[in-house]
């Protein structure tokens, strides 16, 4: 299992458009991947799950992966979040 914390940099957080990019990136990996906010954990490959967390700008989340490509998965998703989804 591999875990990293990241702060969502874009002002509006993970609304529909950036959440879609996040899920698309997560689905590139074989590992099981989760996003956790304040002890609530959801499947990072589920749009409804990610949106249900209500992640706004400035929120710190955990990206968690377990599987063969767990480090690559977490690092790629953290980089995407840190980029601000180019918004």
Where are these regions (language model features)?
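Compact, glycine-rich, soluble single-domain proteins
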Residues: 9-48, 52-57, 87
